[in-house]
Regions:
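Conserved, surface-exposed functional patches that form binding/active-site neighborhoods
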Residues: 133-144, 148-159
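Cleavable N-terminal export/targeting peptides
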Residues: 1-25, 201-202, 217
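Residues on the lipid-exposed face of transmembrane beta-strands in outer-membrane beta-barrel proteins
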Residues: 34, 43-47, 92-96, 108-110, ...
Length: 217
């Protein structure tokens, strides 16, 4: 979690110089942009209702990628787990800019899709065997989103922005996907490892940081 907040701070410092130049630009009704987040790249189409309110439709996906060890939790299970994941989603979001400085915004939204994670044990049950795996799936829809944003003003030209928030989900299902014969032999160990995954990985609230560029027209 410390790495997550450090990443947020670094992103804000890196992109903040690009905002000042837009202050005098004219309001526009439409924007199209690209963004990147832990859930993959996305295409975003925006309609600016007025200078204070925007509605966006987002479409995102991620091919199977490995999670950096630095972003994984401290596991209770000896050896821990490595993780890979895929995702696909679409959502509708409302951004409100309550302050005089239109860079600041509050985002509320609703999305539907799925997130599939495969966790591989660091230590197999038996020496010389392939390590066993678990499937962690978020498939309950819809999910809600709340975030705070900076940038991506509703003005003409290229804009840069960052959004930090959380996805509120119904939780994930955790399934053992290793060899069936090990289920009986190591039933107690498997239950303990699944409990570790539920407590430390399969959260109902998922943090998000999204960095995007958009062109207003």
């Amino acid at each position: 979690m410390k790495q997550f907040f450090a990443l947020i701070a670094a992103c804000v410092l890196a992109i903040s110089p690009s905002f000042a130049q837009d202050a005098g630009d004219d309001f526009v009704e439409y924007g199209v942009g690209l963004a990147i987040s832990p859930f993959g790249p996305s295409l975003n189409l925006t309609y600016n209702v007025d200078a204070k309110n925007s509605i966006s439709a987002g479409f995102g996906f991620s091919p199977e990628v490995s999670a950096p060890d630095a972003l994984l939790p401290d596991w209770d299970t000896p050896g821990g787990f490595s993780a890979t994941g895929t995702s696909s989603w679409m959502g509708v979001f409302w951004r409100h800019r309550p302050l005089e400085n239109d860079n600041f915004g509050v985002n509320l939204g609703m999305a539907a899709g799925q997130i599939e994670n495969t966790l591989t044990a660091g230590i197999p049950f038996h020496e010389g065997e392939d390590p066993h795996t678990y499937q962690v799936s978020y498939t309950e829809n819809p999910v809600m989103y709340f975030g705070l944003s900076y940038g991506l003003k509703p003005v003409k030209g290229l804009q840069v922005g960052v959004d930090v928030g959380v996805l509120s989900t119904g939780g994930a299902s955790v399934e053992y996907t290793g060899h069936a014969e090990e289920m009986e032999e190591h039933e107690e160990e498997i239950e303990l490892e699944m409990e570790d995954i539920r407590d430390n990985f399969a959260w109902t609230m998922l943090p998000n940081i999204q960095i995007g560029v958009s062109y207003g027209f």
